Amino acid sequence: MNAPASNPRVLILCTGNSCRSHMAEGILRAAAGDILEVHSAGSQPSGFVHPKAIAVLAEIGIDISSHTSKSMNDFLDRDINTVITVCGNADQACPIFPGQIHRHHWPFDDPAHATGTEEEILVEFRRVRDEIQAAFLAYAAEAKKITSTSPSA
């Protein structure tokens, strides 16, 4: 679902744009895509979306299989209202975006660095997904509350 251009734009940044930022984008778009235009990008994009990130979001009914890894430079000429960084490296490499009103840094462990058996790695992806989901569902609920109480709503 694509939001109208008049909705506030949220850009979720991570270093590689392969795991955390895509999970956050999928979750936030599913929860608030009707009131927010949600994108993700990376300061050093990996060029792919991690298959386990796709798999653990599918487990909760969110399809990010069509997502692609993008550079934050692709958004420098966009009117971004909020930038949310989800890993430490992106916070230092994040430029000031035009029109940016809000900036948040919510660090999450990188599940791509998980080691162990296939199941242990999936457990780590699920743990990080659940942390991201809790944070971004709360953000979506707050955005909906603000939207419903604004004079133009």
Placement of each model-derived feature along the sequence:
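Conserved active-site segments centered on acidic
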Residues: 1-73
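Alpha-helix termination/capping residues and helix-transition junctions
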Residues: 4, 77, 97-100
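Short coil/turn segments at beta-strand junctions that form active-site/ligand-binding loops
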Residues: 8, 80-81
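S-adenosyl-L-methionine/SAH cofactor-binding core of RNA-modifying enzymes
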Residues: 65-80, 89-91
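Redox-cofactor binding/interface segments in oxidoreductases and associated redox assembly factors
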Residues: 85-86
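Phosphate-binding/catalytic loops
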Residues: 91-153
